[in-house]
Amino acid sequence: IAFNLYKPIQQHDRTKIIDIVSLFGYYYRNIGLVVLGGGIIVSLFIPMIFGKSDFSFGVIYFAFYSYLASSLIGYFINYRQALLSADQRNYVVAVYYQSANILKVIIQLTIAYYFANFYVWIAIELSFGILYSFILNKKIDQVYPWLKCTVAIGKSQSKNYPNILQS
């Protein structure tokens, strides 16, 4: 989909950019719903998969749903970052991601050393995923203040771009 943004970006066609990014959000929301459904189904089998684990099921479920939530953030919230990539500004994503990741690992290592608490480790993982998404989306709003995307726009544009997934 980022490929489809090159021409509208070059032509400064904001309407088309909004349409394509909204369409991307629509597709990603649908994929996210499938991933969510699959994750819920897989979670039903956790007792069979981890039946002989030394970890409590509370920790296992908390970790599973936290990582699932972190993954779903990309599908439901971060889809607009494709515009940064297509606009040759992927360095913004890299800077924010690497900075957040370094800080997260330092905090997790400190927590692991002093407290050895799995729940806190996992909560930090999820918290930084949410924080990263929030900061990245604020930056996208700053760089592209005109970018007002909605899933409704994306759904309505799916018929106007029938071949967008093939490119």
Regions found by a protein language model. Give the residues of each.
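Signature of the first transmembrane helix
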Residues: 1-7, 36-39, 70, 104-105, ...
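Substrate-agnostic recognition of the 12-TM MFS/MFS-like secondary transporter fold
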Residues: 7, 25-28, 74-104, 163
